[in-house]
Structure formats: C-alpha cells, structure tokens
C-alpha cells in the first residue's frame, strides 16, 4: 500500500486516480457526512452546485429528504440545514437522504468520483478509515484534503497525519508516496494533544468562530467518536460501509 497526501483537489496529478481515495474535509463536510449516517440517514448525496442539488432533490419525496447548503461557513438561505454536524440528530435524519453542497468538501469528492474505492474521513471516524485501509489494502491511496477555496488547510492535513500515524501505530505497513505524508504526520505529532487549539488557529476555524460555531470546532477536533465509514456506492452518493 502506497499512500499519498494531497492538500487540495487542485494539487492532485492530472489524468490519474488511485485505487482508493480518502476525502477529508474536517471543517466540516466529511464530519457531517459521517455523523448523518451514524444517526440514521439513508444516504448522503453530494453536489458541487447548489442548482444541481435543488434540481436532483426535487425528484425525491419531500418527507424523505433534507437539503443542506453551505457557502463561506454559513448556511444558505432556503435550505433545511447548513453544514454543522451538531444539527444531525436521529429525530431529524433517520430514514432520510441528505442532499449536501458545501464550499470545499463536495468539490474534492467530485475530483475523485470515478475512483474504484472512495470513502470519506475526518477525525471523528479516523479509526474506521484506518480499519478499512487495513482490511482492503488498496495498492495506491490518496488522502485528499479539501482545503479552502484551493488553498491549504491545517485541519485537513492534521487529519491525514492522524490516519497515517494510526496505521503506523497498528503496525500496518505502507510506503510513503510523497513528502506531504511525512509533513502531515509531523503536524499531527506536534498537535495531537491539543487539536482544538490548532483548529482555533486555522483560518477556517477562525471563520467558524466568527459565526459562533465553537462547539462545531470542539466536536470536529475529537478523535474516534464514530465507527461509521461513508463509502461511495454510486457517483456522489455515500452510505455507511
């Protein structure tokens, strides 16, 4: 198993896909996706475009759907939800499909939608991602951060480092595919005992703090809360593996 870390979808190699892509958007799309499936959502369907989300979701029964839209960290007017994992409750989500469009995470998912294996990870379900990689042993793996509008993000990189570090701790052998893997592990080693403070310093963490989303940061900075691994079952549609 050879692992590569890419900080944003724009930095991935052109005309290339891995055997397995692990998409990461800790603040907050992949945290929200895992949480929604954990509390009973039937599936999460992701869209880069808000217009595409609305058009597709119109064909779904109203009582069986929820629409979640986020841009710039804030909820989009006219949608049922924004992108907070704390809004994902079993009372709201059970048996429904969540139609989701966010600023960054859904773009990353679009980049690798044709991968043979596509899963999503965050700190809250890091262990589930590691277990999946250990069991399936894909030849090449991309840990793909979503970043922020094409730029680097601390939170996605530290999550990639957390995944690689846990693989090492469990004795699961892998080859380092690029220097970004080493850098991500180093960042995680430095901050693993103080992830919330790291998130407070991250640019997107600061955006969310200005929107009074401290509890979102606290939740997203917690490791191994959820044993669910979202996996793509058809383009853009994720269910619990």
UniProtKB/Swiss-Prot annotation:
Keywords tagged on the record: Hydrolase, Magnesium
EC number(s) reported in the record: 3.1.3.71
Cofactors (names): Mg(2+)
Positions of disulphide bridges: none
Keyword Methyltransferase in record: no
Swiss-Prot/TrEMBL catalytic activity: (2R)-O-phospho-3-sulfolactate + H2O = (2R)-3-sulfolactate + phosphate
One function term, GO molecular function aspect: magnesium ion binding
Family: Belongs to the ComB family.
PANTHER family: 2-PHOSPHOSULFOLACTATE PHOSPHATASE-RELATED
NCBIfam families, per the entry: PRK00886.1-5
Name the UniProt record assigns to this protein: Probable 2-phosphosulfolactate phosphatase
């Amino acid at each position: 198993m050879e692992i590569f870390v890419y900080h944003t979808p724009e930095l991935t190699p052109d005309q290339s896909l891995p055997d397995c892509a692990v998409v990461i958007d800790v603040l907050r799309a992949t945290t929200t996706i895992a949480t929604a499936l954990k509390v009973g959502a039937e599936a999460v369907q992701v869209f880069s475009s808000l217009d595409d989300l609305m058009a597709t979701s119109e064909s779904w029964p109203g009582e069986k759907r929820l629409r979640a839209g986020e841009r710039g960290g804030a909820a989009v007017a006219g949608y049922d939800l924004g992108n907070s994992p704390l809004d994902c409750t079993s009372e709201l989500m059970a048996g429904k499909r969540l139609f989701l469009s966010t600023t960054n995470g859904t773009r990353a998912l679009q980049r690798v939608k044709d991968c043979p294996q596509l899963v999503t990870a965050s700190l809250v379900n890091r262990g589930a991602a590691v277990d999946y990689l250990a069991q399936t042993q894909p030849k090449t793996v991309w840990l793909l951060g979503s970043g922020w509008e094409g730029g680097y993000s601390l939170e996605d990189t530290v999550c990639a480092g957390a995944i690689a570090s846990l693989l090492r701790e469990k004795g699961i052998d892998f080859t380092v595919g690029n220097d970004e893997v080493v850098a991500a592990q180093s960042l995680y080693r430095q901050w693993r005992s103080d992830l919330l403070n790291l998130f407070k310093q991250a640019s997107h963490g600061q955006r969310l703090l200005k929107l009074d989303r401290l509890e979102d940061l606290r939740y997203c900075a917690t490791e191994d809360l959820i044993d669910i691994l979202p996996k793509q079952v058809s383009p853009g549609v994720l269910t619990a593996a």
